[in-house]
Amino acid sequence: MISSKFGIGQQVRHKLLGYLGVIIDVDPEYSLEKPSLEEISADDSLRRSPWYYVVMEDEDGKPVHTYLAEAQLGYEISPVHPEQPKLDELSASIKKQLKTPRLRN
């Protein structure tokens, strides 16, 4: 069984680039059809670890969807980011949806 460090709705930081992001989905292992060289290293263990769909912002504040390995992400301690309030709102919205049960009918 593969366990993941991060959960859906959690804010994270890219370890190398320092970008703030919000996790919107998790795969137990790499699941895209054709990995690019930037996404997969020569070490196959990276491919077998959890991968995350993460929303980040570009320099203009527009959302950027990324697919990142668990090894590329670190915990974000601060829950509030005045420079990127949209990501704070996205994180809060996702967490609220996960806590609130939905009626199907």
UniProtKB/Swiss-Prot annotation:
Residues 84-105 are annotated as: Disordered. Keywords: Cytoplasm, Stress response. Residues 96-105 have a biased composition (Basic residues). GO terms for molecular function: DNA binding. SUPFAM superfamilies: YccV-like. It comes from the Bacteria. GO terms for cellular component: cytoplasm. It is found in: Cytoplasm. Its main location: cytoplasm. GO terms for biological process: response to heat. The keyword Cytoplasm applies. Coiled coil: none annotated. Involved in the degradation of certain denaturated proteins, including DnaA, during heat shock stress. Belongs to the HspQ family. This is Heat shock protein HspQ. It comes from Wigglesworthia glossinidia brevipalpis. The gene is hspQ.
